[in-house]
Amino acid sequence: MNPKRSFQALILTLHSYWADKGCAVLQPYDMEVGAGTFHPATTLRALGPKPWKAAYVQPSRRPSDGRYGENPNRLQHYYQYQVILKPNPPNLQELYLGSLAAIGLDPLLHDIRFVEDDWESPTLGAWGLGWECWCDGMEVSQFTYFQQVCGIECAPVAGELTYGLERLAMYVQGVDNVYDLNFNGREGDEKISYGDVFLQAEQEYSRHNFEFANTEMLHRHFVDAEKECRALLDAGAPADNANQRLHKCVFPAYDQCIKASHVFNLLDARGVISVTERQSYILRVRTLAKACGEAFLLTDAGGVNLSKEAA
């Protein structure tokens, strides 16, 4: 399949490229997240000493960015391609440029520039040194060296690559409207466009996000998710006796943190959160994320070494 001819071929080419580099090619996380970084394969696995390599597509929702399907390149639901490499390889930029070449953007034929743009996620308590990648004057991706996630220092530092798939596909296909993207690589009656797949949903979710979402219910959902996250962290915490040295319930707790974050984004889109309240909500989600990150470090995947502790 030609990555210049279809959206799905672009994704499959990136899958193949990063699989060849040793990454586990994962599936999208089955929850509403604002960015690929929220996937536990990045947020949690960036913590602790254990090496980790993964790549995946993540549907991402940013309710405030909806434009009722009338904007050619701004969406409330879109796709990111995420790569996480821990420890950060010394040739991360070279690997990234190789991925561009694989999808048809030869760095020798295009003006590829890296513009310094440090990254931060206030709700995740995460930040890193980073650069935007511009191709012939258009931003197509970002790469970041994680310094902190969940308010916890990353040791070793992890390298993260984030591709904006729609924007990248628009560039390689040479179209100006995201809904005109060829999705399946066929022509004529067999052609399926991005608009055929997503335009109606984009219109309807814009109405939901800005007009119809029940704000009283959303407020309750936020509080419920916050309480459940804390309750699960408490329930799974290591016991004082030697029979339970590991945390037993990190991922379910982190799911509740993700839910709280998405509900906050919906409330923000509905315009019912003041500037002061907004900072309070961000702090509450960040507090949950930090607690989940700390709990993850008490698991085998987080790198806790029980043999050394017992010695």
UniProtKB/Swiss-Prot annotation:
The protein's name: Glycine--tRNA ligase alpha subunit
InterPro entries: aa-tRNA-synth_II/BPL/LPL, Gly-tRNA-synth_heterodimer, Gly-tRNA_ligase_asu
Domain of life of the organism encoding this protein: Bacteria
Enzyme class: ligase
Family note: Belongs to the class-II aminoacyl-tRNA synthetase family.
Signal peptide: none
Coiled coil start-end: none
Keywords for the protein's UniProt record, in alphabetical order: Aminoacyl-tRNA synthetase, ATP-binding, Cytoplasm, Ligase, Nucleotide-binding, Protein biosynthesis
PROSITE patterns per record: AA_TRNA_LIGASE_II_GLYAB
Pfam families, per the entry: tRNA-synt_2e
Catalytic activity, EC: 6.1.1.14
Isomerase among keywords: no
Record organism: Rhizobium leguminosarum bv. trifolii (strain WSM2304)
Subunit structure as annotated in this protein's UniProt entry: Tetramer of two alpha and two beta subunits.
